[in-house]
Amino acid sequence: MLTLSDFDFPLPPELIAQSALPDRSASRLLVVERTAPEDTSEAVRLVDRAFSDILEYLNPDDLLVFNDTRVIKARFFGHKPSGGRIEVLVERVVDTHTVLAQVRASKTPVEGSLLHLADDAFAVTVGPRVDQFFTLRFPEPALDLIERYGRLPLPPYITHDPDAYDETRYQTVYARNPGAVAAPTAGLHFDDALFARLDAAGIRRAFLTLHVGAGTFQPVRTENLSEHKMHSEWYAISPELADAVRETRARGGRVIAVGTTSLRALESAAAEDGTLEAGSGDTDIFITPGYAFRIVDALITNFHLPKSTLLMLVSALAGVEAIRDAYRHAVDARYRFFSYGDAMLLTRRDRRA
């Protein structure tokens, strides 16, 4: 049985990308080509490419599925009425005036109290606890105040304060539905010029929404993976996407998820017969090796943190040994890691590229 330690790997800190490249599609692409379904080093071939070469690995019958969530400026600093400093990270917008948020303070805020945010620009009212989150009531529409006064919530491994460059580059060019507190980073490699090339090649694309939560950075704290409690995120699948997946299957094409968030939404909405069901809801799907994929055939993704649930997910798709070899190669070849880093193209173990 696999344990948490099986998903650890040494990563030199200088390989953690601290800023985005000037050109979105100028990143590198590690293609993990599968030659046989066995989970062995001999069953895969690792190919170093540029991300702009990705069209060479796509077919006209394929469908790329993107997550169109938009990152909100979810981080606030402020103080309690007593003067004690606080930090607020919005996790989810519940309705027009209400959010769920993490609140860091020396003492737990009291229900009914006020938290003064953004240099006293406004105050929110503390409501009931929901698991580890606080309900906060905003005096005006929450998304308006978040956009006006909040700060971009860069991942914890990016060490600089967010600036105007990050506000553009930590956002996909197709982001349109605000609600995420972390970017669907595989999509950061796509720009309008690359989309034009995809269109010219007849590669179809479709969109879903999954609002990425801060739980995506939550560490796994137990060696026994079955004891890990996965975070929950809201997603929506349109009837148009469900139709596109069905048409792709009928034509013999592949469903290629752009990012692990797209994959998690697709697999969460999969029926037992392998069809995709339109609708919306929350998902806490935890994909580990042994999972039987129903929708996704291939995945474009960045490199993930050691011991993370996302490293387990890509291992489930491509094979544990294949991912170990790929990550070892990526470190040796000095690939850039994590949100602003380079990308991989992975194919399901039971599929051929």
Curated annotation (Swiss-Prot):
Give one Pfam hit by family name.
Queuosine_synth
UniProt keyword terms in alphabetical order: Cytoplasm, Queuosine biosynthesis, S-adenosyl-L-methionine, Transferase
One GO MF term? S-adenosylmethionine:tRNA ribosyltransferase-isomerase activity
The record's GO CC annotations read:
cytoplasm
Read off the SUPFAM superfamilies from this record: QueA-like
Primary localisation category: cytoplasm
Compartments annotated for it: namely: Cytoplasm
> Which family, according to the similarity comment?
Belongs to the QueA family.
User: What PANTHER family is this protein classified in?
Assistant: S-ADENOSYLMETHIONINE:TRNA RIBOSYLTRANSFERASE-ISOMERASE
- Name of protein: S-adenosylmethionine:tRNA ribosyltransferase-isomerase
Q: What is the lineage of its organism?
A: Bacteria, Pseudomonadati, Pseudomonadota, Betaproteobacteria, Burkholderiales
Which gene carries the instructions for this protein? queA
